[in-house]
């Protein structure tokens, strides 16, 4: 019996006839989906958790202390203990690794840690550290207790990563001088510093690098009530009149992600200013987000397209990732890292050994109803 991987195949496990039979088990209730994004607009950009090029978050919106940091309660407790212990011993923090979907605040919490420790904060990204010279430039200028933050740390070049091993473990920088038989290694002592890494793909990190972090912590999606607090805080800092119901409407469509919540808030603010009196109520927020094609569950047209294609062309699945990408025209990595995490989180999609499967909850949300029993979930 052949097992078809959800990643390794671009073809669905079932033939056209079987797919047609399964698709006939479904009919759409009442309405058709309109993929407005295919007509030129791209409202889906609002819901992408990655920071947009040129998108700058006002520094005033960033929390500066753990007390100001909303959400991630368990993580904050762990970090507060680590900070208190390090302060008592008058030592730098152990190295930390944060992982989780984009937009959850990994960079922000790293900056908060540096501020809590009274340390200088240096920030870079792994793709910017192309050669050993790049990382060495940071390491040699770090003072005791300084924090070096590397985003997308899973993308470090191997030669750069290997240079970090002795730096993290023994606080020394090994430099090779010369070439061939005349080459020799010189070690330079480094000040005790704290390295904080952030990644959306912890499985892509090598074991030697991952094992050198004293703390490995996951950031989870935010609860709606936490996002309401974040939206109200943003409204207060930006001096925008917002009632709790309006904040709740924005929060529940924000895919559990603070970055998206703040982005949606700014678009609703624009709408309220132009179409209303500037006040954000529940009605104003709902009207604005409907205009931007963000539905009450936080799905955009691409989310609905992915789910609808699975239902109407493949009877709900299972479907391999490469097949989904080919049919929808989306990049496989984009589907896996941008769209799938939230669909999995809210229970609209399942991963199985044979591929992706749409759940009954997603079918109800999209307005489908079953005409016959489904073998694919049995």
Swiss-Prot record:
Region entry Small ATPAse domain (RuvB-S), spans: 223-293
Highest taxon of the lineage: Bacteria
Record organism: Synechococcus sp. (strain JA-3-3Ab)
A biological process term (GO) from this entry: DNA repair
Entry keyword annotation includes Cell inner membrane: no
Compartments it resides in: Cytoplasm
Name of the protein: Holliday junction branch migration complex subunit RuvB 1
Gene3D superfamilies found in the cross-reference section: 1.10.8.60, P-loop containing nucleotide triphosphate hydrolases (3.40.50.300), Winged helix-like DNA-binding domain superfamily/Winged helix DNA-binding domain (1.10.10.10)
Keyword DNA damage assigned: yes
An annotated GO cellular component: Holliday junction resolvase complex
Cross-referenced InterPro entries: AAA+_ATPase, AAA_lid_4, DNA_helicase_Holl-junc_RuvB, P-loop_NTPase, RuvB-like_N, RuvB_C, WH-like_DNA-bd_sf, WH_DNA-bd_sf
């Amino acid at each position: 019996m052949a097992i078809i991987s959800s990643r390794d195949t671009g073809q669905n496990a079932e033939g056209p006839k079987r797919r047609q039979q399964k698709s006939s088990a479904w009919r759409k209730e009442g309405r058709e989906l309109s993929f407005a994004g295919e007509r030129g607009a791209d409202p889906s950009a609002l819901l992408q958790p990655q920071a947009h090029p040129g998108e700058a978050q006002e520094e005033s919106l960033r929390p500066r202390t753990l007390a100001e940091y909303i959400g991630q309660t368990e993580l904050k407790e762990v970090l507060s203990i680590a900070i208190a212990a390090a302060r008592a011993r008058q030592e730098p923090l152990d190295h930390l690794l944060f992982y989780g979907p984009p937009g959850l605040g990994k960079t922000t919490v790293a900056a908060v840690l540096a501020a809590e420790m009274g340390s200088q904060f240096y920030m870079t990204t792994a793709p910017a550290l192309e050669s050993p010279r790049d990382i060495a430039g940071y390491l040699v200028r770090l003072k005791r207790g300084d924090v070096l933050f590397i985003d997308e740390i899973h993308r470090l070049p191997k030669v750069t990563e290997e240079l970090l091993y002795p730096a993290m473990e023994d606080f020394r920088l090994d430099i090779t001088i010369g070439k061939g038989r005349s080459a020799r290694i010189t070690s330079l002592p480094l000040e005790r510093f704290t390295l904080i890494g952030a990644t959306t793909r912890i499985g892509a990190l090598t074991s030697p690098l991952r094992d050198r972090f004293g703390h490995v912590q996951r950031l989870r999606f935010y609860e709606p009530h936490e996002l309401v607090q974040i939206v109200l805080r943003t409204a207060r800092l930006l001096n925008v009149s917002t009632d709790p119901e309006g904040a709740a409407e924005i929060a529940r469509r924000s895919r559990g992600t603070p970055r998206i919540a703040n982005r949606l808030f700014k678009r609703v603010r624009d709408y309220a200013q132009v179409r209303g009196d500037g006040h954000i109520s529940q009605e104003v927020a709902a009207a604005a987000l409907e205009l931007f094609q963000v539905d009450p569950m936080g799905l955009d047209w691409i989310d609905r397209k992915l789910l609808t294609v699975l239902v109407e062309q493949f009877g709900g699945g299972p479907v391999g990732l490469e097949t989904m990408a080919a049919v929808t025209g989306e990049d496989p990595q984009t589907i896996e890292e941008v769209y799938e995490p939230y669909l999995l989180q809210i229970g609209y999609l399942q991963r199985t050994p044979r591929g992706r499967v749409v759940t009954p909850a997603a079918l109800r949300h999209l307005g489908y109803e079953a005409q016959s029993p489904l073998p694919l979930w049995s």
